[in-house]
A protein has these predicted regions:
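Alpha-helical DNA-contacting segments of helix-turn-helix folds
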Residues: 28, 61-73, 77, 115
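Amphipathic alpha-helical segments used for helix-helix packing
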Residues: 95-123, 157
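Hydrophobic alpha-helical connector segments
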Residues: 65, 79-106
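Generic hydrophobic, amphipathic alpha-helix propensity
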Residues: 13-24, 41, 66-70, 74
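N-terminal intrinsically disordered/low-complexity leader segments
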Residues: 1-15
Length: 183
């Protein structure tokens, strides 16, 4: 697809790739509800457009790369928080996951939109489902996937209406997800 990200291998290229992402993040943080363009990234970063197109063939590919970067950060936090959990109760795992996700979203409000793209939803939903299946092998993968999509969409709903995840929305997201899991 036209949003394919070409990941660099060489050190110099990796630095350029990172610079594009840093600039894109800077633009998103300074302009709320802004649509990112390669032209703006080129202007602000001082990089030439052809060198940006080398890694990012489209505007969407920059957003996808930012999504991936923040999804991986969130997933690492989730895994760290689940490391010390020694019980296999799937509901307890989801409580932790939902809390960590809400905290991450609230601490990164300016760029949280990138966690709610279709690309991010697919990545998070797959990775979280796999993590839950690893911790609780008795749960059905499809059930984990649906539970994950449920809490992500309810957190997004809260984020959209309040520009953060309030304790009330967090509580309701957990209740909905846990209610589904208990059936």
């Amino acid at each position: 697809s036209s949003s394919e990200i070409i990941k660099p291998q060489q050190k110099r290229s990796i630095k350029r790739f990172e610079k594009v992402l840093e600039t894109a993040e800077y633009i998103l943080k300074s302009e709320s509800s802004y649509s990112l363009t390669i032209q703006d990234v080129a202007k602000i970063s001082g990089m030439k457009r052809p060198s940006i197109y080398k890694f990012f063939p489209s505007n969407e590919s920059i957003v996808d790369a930012l999504s991936e970067k923040h999804c991986l950060k969130l997933l690492n936090l989730i895994k760290k928080n689940l490391e010390n959990v020694n019980y296999s109760n799937v509901s307890e795992h989801y409580k932790i996951i939902i809390d960590v996700a809400a905290i991450y979203i609230n601490q990164n409000k300016e760029i949280s939109e990138v966690l709610f793209t279709k690309f991010a939803e697919d990545l998070l939903s797959t990775a979280i489902s796999e993590e839950i299946s690893r911790l609780s092998p008795n749960t059905k993968p499809i059930k984990n996937q649906i539970a994950t999509q449920m809490f992500l969409s309810s957190l997004y709903s809260g984020f959209k209406s309040e520009k953060s995840i309030s304790p009330a929305f967090l509580g309701e997201s957990k209740r909905a997800c846990l209610s589904y899991l208990s059936n």
